[in-house]
A protein has these predicted regions:
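Terminal amphipathic alpha-helical/low-complexity segments used for targeting or macromolecular assembly
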Residues: 1-18, 121-176
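Short beta->alpha connector loops
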Residues: 8, 30-39
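Short N-terminal helix-initiation segments at or just after the protein's N-terminus
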Residues: 16-29, 60, 174
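Left-handed beta-helix
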Residues: 23, 28-29, 34, 44-45, ...
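Flexible, solvent-exposed loop segments that connect beta-strands
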Residues: 62-68
């Protein structure tokens, strides 16, 4: 009941209606998965939808002019991260091993192993290049374990200062 009051969707109810969701699915706050046509949506294994992502399977813009709403199958592959505030439009297929950058509007298919950003989303590099760039940024003093996250109940000033210092020195830090 509390989730409903916050405007959160009941994932179990969507699955009962026909939404297909793989293992390891993470749906953060404010995510909207098209409730009126969820059976047209398939989400693979190890997918994260960051806050306020919308996944659509219908387009009602045709209703006024044609008397019918356009619907299409929307598919998200395995090992996909969709950044905050992104919108995935009906009929799109996002391949495996893909990152969609925050705020992107996915209007066309995204191939396997891609990084896509923008409005409309376009592929800007391969997953391989993205991972190599980030590996190069990882140094012994800017990579931290779970102790340096809020999942650690004793996270405090010392951990916060270490993270801030690493970001100041390298421009970025990495946490588990």
């Amino acid at each position: 009941m509390l989730a409903w009051l916050r405007g959160e969707q009941d994932l179990a109810k969507l699955v009962k209606r026909g939404l297909v969701v793989g293992k390891g699915f993470v749906k953060m706050g404010g995510v909207i998965i098209d409730p009126s046509h969820c059976w047209h949506i398939t989400i693979g294994d190890n997918v994260t939808l960051a806050p306020n992502v919308h996944v659509l399977a219908h387009d009602a813009s045709t209703k006024v002019f044609l008397g019918h709403t356009r619907v299409a199958n929307t598919k998200i592959g395995n090992n996909v991260f969709v950044g905050a505030g992104s919108i995935i439009l009906p009929g799109v297929t996002i391949g495996n091993n893909v990152v969609v950058g925050a705020g992107s509007v996915v209007t066309k298919d995204i191939p396997d192993g891609s990084i896509a950003i923008g409005n409309p989303a376009r592929v800007v590099k391969s997953m391989e290049a993205f991972l190599e760039e980030n590996r190069q940024l990882m140094k012994p003093d800017n990579v931290f374990d779970e102790q340096f996250t809020l999942r650690n109940s004793s996270f405090g000033e010392k951990e916060r200062e270490a993270l801030l210092a690493a970001c100041e020195k390298y421009g970025v830090a990495f946490v588990k």
